[in-house]
Regions:
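A glycine-/small-residue-rich N-terminal strand-loop-strand element
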Residues: 47, 68-91
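NAD(P)H dinucleotide-binding glycine-rich loop of Rossmann-like/cofactor-binding domains
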Residues: 86-149
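C-terminal capping/lid region of NAD(P)-dependent oxidoreductase domains
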Residues: 289, 293-299, 310-329
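N-terminal glycine-rich beta->alpha transition that marks the start or flank
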Residues: 11, 20-68
Length: 329
């Protein structure tokens, strides 16, 4: 089968396209003939970890965690799926290929009306945003949340979920041309990362108070400034929480991290429980149903061929996509 591999770690991760043996099907696994692969934020993070020697590439080298397609094989212990079922599946690695195996517990049937692109992009984004924002982050009506890199896949879903809580939402966009598209999902307070004085504008929009919650999808951009905008006792969610903000002063007065008073709560953008947890699985299923009904939007910015994986990753990092990027084998 055709697949995308990660190699060349000593000189930085290199994505290459080639052939690989078909994956082995364990008793609790589902074999999926892939229709569309989604490139998730967690995939980008893993490449960064490989680059810095903080993690090893997966056995066999095939990267990617999520894809939609059709069930082509089932393990002996699988009970919820049949051959031919349309599904989306999540696993630690192996999705960037024509065939993908994933545990039954982290595989979902596609709700009627859900297109394969939105399906491929759904599980991780839905689980990570919901858990970070609503479960661990406890965002409430009347609070103010600032979303950095708001046009990312995670940023766009965070906008929608935050608005549903009744919170005030401010977004920082790298591409000012996206304003009209952001307004269509309900965001009205939009700051330009390149044209606006973000600190001054946020303080203006909050009458000098600052924000209760920062949801930072960037790779550490503006961390020091954004932490200063969080009120004491507020929350800061990011991918590299410990490294990027543990030592940052926070609050309008620039309190030291060990200062007396309410601490800044630091949250990783992730699910507290694994994707195969029954509660996570159920929540993702409900939210996918909402996407199928048009109640939530999960935009797909561009589709690449699987053999163009290197270009697809580069597009995400430098092309300012609005939402997800997917690949077709």
């Amino acid at each position: 089968m055709n697949a995308v591999f990660c190699s060349g770690i000593e000189d930085g991760p290199l994505l290459t396209f080639g052939t690989a043996p078909e994956p082995q099907l364990a008793e609790n696994m589902v074999l999926v003939r892939v229709e569309l692969v989604s490139i998730e934020a967690i995939d980008l993070i893993k490449l960064a970890l490989y680059r810095h020697g903080l993690a090893e590439p997966p056995p066999g080298g095939i990267v990617g965690c999520q894809a939609s397609g059709t069930v082509e094989g089932i393990g002996a212990q699988v009970t919820r799926f049949r051959l031919g079922d349309r599904v989306v599946a999540y696993h630690a690695c192996g999705s960037h290929a024509e065939l993908f195996v994933a545990p039954e517990a982290s595989t979902w049937h596609l709700p009627e009306g859900l297109d394969p692109g939105s399906a491929a992009a759904a599980p991780f984004t839905l689980a990570a945003t919901r858990d970070t924002l609503c479960n661990r982050g406890r965002l409430r009506a009347g609070e103010t949340i600032l979303i950095n890199h708001v046009t990312s896949s995670l940023g766009l879903m965070t906008v929608q979920l935050a608005l549903e809580t009744g919170a005030k939402v401010i977004g920082i966009a790298r591409d000012p041309a996206c304003r009209d598209r952001l307004r269509k999902i309900g965001l009205t307070e939009i700051l330009s990362a390149t044209r606006d004085d973000v600190m001054a504008r946020c303080l203006e929009l909050t009458q000098g108070r600052g924000v209760d919650f920062v949801f930072d999808v960037s790779a550490g951009e503006r961390t020091a400034d954004l932490a200063r905008l969080v009120v004491p006792g507020g929350r800061y969610a990011a991918f590299s929480v410990i490294d990027s903000i543990a030592d940052q002063p926070y609050g309008p007065d620039g309190a030291a991290p060990d200062a007396t008073g309410p601490e800044l709560e630091r949250l990783p953008i992730m699910t507290a429980s694994p994707m195969h947890d029954p509660a996570v699985h159920a929540q993702v299923g409900v939210m996918m149903g909402r996407i199928a009904k048009g109640e939530l939007q999960l935009p797909i910015e561009h589709e690449f061929a699987l053999c163009e994986a290197a270009e697809a990753y580069d597009f995400i990092l430098h092309g300012r996509p609005f939402g997800h990027v997917v690949m077709r084998p």
